[in-house]
């Protein structure tokens, strides 16, 4: 059947590609700040966009999203102390962190090696004319991985214990409270979604080009539209010591 014939079928309504079947009306209204053409279904529920506490409110089936990994790791251990089941989505993130422990003898060596590598990369950026290396997106990505690895290392007895902890934290299973970077949440959805460290969305301090700026806007849109019914911003919780 030709596509033009489909609209002759009774009760068939033409929808634009920007119409979302997933999100409640208030969530769509919020997302329109970043994607103005987005529209909700006429029969969508109103839904809720509000502030709240991820530590006190998050339950099984909820998503918790962040622009970077490090805050999610700290949240994972918060939930562990509260005896709440949680995982960080992305087994390949865990494998990448485990790869960073290859040929390392002990935790002290691990810390020294990766702090030196991070500093060396910073110096190379300076040598190549980058005025503020901390605001370079590649540096920020490496720094996030190093800080994540070293945080888990501080809670580990030795390198083998560190690897086991990493394997238990990062998973592709969908169970408990699902902690995820926005990148890893693409294509997923939940009735309720928390966003932590909303100051990192969009991550404007690392922007060097218009293309990067647009990618950050796209990520912010992705984060918002993972929520079907309720979107909760936690503006108070922070991973900063």
Language-model features: where?
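The feature marks helicase ATPase cores and/or their adjacent C-terminal helical subdomains
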Residues: 1-241
């Amino acid at each position: 059947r030709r596509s033009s014939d489909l609209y002759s079928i009774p009760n068939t309504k033409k929808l634009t590609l920007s119409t979302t079947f997933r999100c409640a009306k208030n969530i769509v209204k919020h997302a329109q700040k970043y994607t103005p053409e987005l529209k909700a279904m006429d029969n969508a529920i109103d839904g809720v966009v509000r502030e709240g506490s991820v530590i006190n409110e998050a339950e099984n089936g909820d998503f918790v999203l962040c622009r970077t990994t490090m805050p999610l790791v700290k949240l994972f251990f918060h939930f562990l102390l509260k005896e709440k089941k949680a995982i960080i989505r992305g087994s390949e993130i865990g494998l990448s962190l485990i790869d960073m422990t290859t040929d390392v003898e002990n935790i002290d060596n691990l810390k020294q090696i990766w702090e030196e590598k991070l500093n060396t990369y910073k110096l190379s950026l300076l040598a190549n004319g980058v005025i503020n290396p901390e605001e370079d997106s590649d540096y920020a990505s490496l720094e996030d991985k190093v800080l994540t690895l070293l945080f888990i290392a501080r809670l580990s007895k030795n390198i083998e214990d560190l690897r086991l902890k990493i394997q238990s934290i990062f998973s592709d299973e969908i169970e408990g409270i699902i902690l995820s970077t926005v990148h890893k949440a693409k294509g997923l959805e939940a009735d309720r979604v928390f966003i932590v460290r909303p100051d990192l969305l969009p991550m404007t301090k690392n922007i060097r080009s218009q293309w990067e700026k647009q990618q950050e806007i796209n990520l912010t849109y992705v984060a918002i539209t993972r929520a079907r019914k309720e979107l909760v911003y936690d503006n108070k919780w922070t991973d900063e010591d």
